[in-house]
Amino acid sequence: MGSTRRTALIFGVLFLATFVFSIGGLALYSPALHPAKFMAGIGGATRARLGLSCEVLLIIANVGTAVVIFPILRRQNEALALGYVTARLVEATFIAIGIVSLLAVVTLRHDAGASLLSDAKALVAVRNWTFVIGPGFWAGVGNGLILGYLMYRSGLMPRGLAIFGLIGGALICISGLGVVLDVFNKGGAAQVIATIPEFIWELSLGIYPIFWGFKASPILEAGPASA
């Protein structure tokens, strides 16, 4: 297996891992998002901790996708390739803040139970907003707009799929800002619909490189350069 094929395989596996850890993690820690019930003892604390551990692994996978592909993408445009790494780090930072917030909720439940419900609600609110700004905005900037553009220009992925990334990234950014500005409801129909192209794009970033590798592209033969 050549180095480029190996990079494509690792890149794809990491992208699929982001789906597994994000969906699996949310399923496990979701009771903690309902502080009134959680602080009253409904939903296991161990289950929540396992879910938040998945979120930690999600951060590793998120950043890993950018680090693994950077040496190749920099040959297309080094500034944008670095921008992709930065966008993933910013997204990961917001995810980390959300993790800490929910771990604090678990601690409050263990130490004081329902007596600190208002504090738990505030921490859950922090986590919810980190989700809006992190995966709900910066994922659109990084995976959608920047990576979509780089893949479109380089031809490493089918350009039809890369267009999904560009459209999806723009829609994610618009819907995320719309939620912040109270134009759209958080988790409402507009935001859900806006995620569909980005979902297709990110899923293809996991599946296509694993089974077919990257498409033939001049940047796979060229040295580092900006374009």
Residue ranges of predicted features:
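Hydrophobic, aromatic-enriched alpha-helical segments typical of multi-pass transmembrane helices
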Residues: M1-A227
